[in-house]
Amino acid sequence: MKNITVIGAGTMGNGIAHTFAQRDFNVNLVDISADALERALETIERNLDRMVKKETITIKDKIATLSKITPFTDITEGVKNTDLVVEAATENVELKLKIFKKLDELCNSDTILASNTSSISITKIASVTNIEDRVVGMHFMNPVT
């Protein structure tokens, strides 16, 4: 597994993208809002700057991490050739079901689909897909580390 897509560039999404990128995964960060993507990348860079200041990473590590994240406003492009999708959209059941229906249409049958939901049934989310056995819950706590 090398390519990961994160859906949603808010607090959780940018933290998840940062964490995967820092661990050398290629990360596509998808959001319908270009402004949200810009804010997410700024937040990630600010967090990396703090890590450089604390000497927990080097500037080279920061640059490498940022180079691993590619922003997309188009979900179709953002999920191409991905091994894992982590959905971190707003905690809204209708929205999440809509996203998973779309992911089911767009992703390869071997792509793992994960939701960061804290309250919605994974079984319910999986039920809108044709690959129920590849839908999982992957709940991250804030801050993501």
Put a short name on every predicted segment:
Residues 25, 80, 143-145:
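Acidic/polar active-site rim loop that often engages polyanionic ligands
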Residues 1-47, 54:
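NAD(P)+-binding Rossmann beta1-loop-alpha1 motif at the extreme N-terminus of oxidoreductases
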Residues 7, 30, 72, 88, ...:
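Structural motif
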Residues 50-112, 120:
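Rossmann-like NAD(P)-binding element
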Residues 26, 68-70, 134:
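Conserved beta-strand segments of alpha/beta enzyme cores
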Residues 112-145:
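Rossmann-fold dinucleotide-binding core
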Residues 40, 99, 103, 125-126:
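Hydrophobic packing residues within well-ordered alpha-helices of enzyme cores
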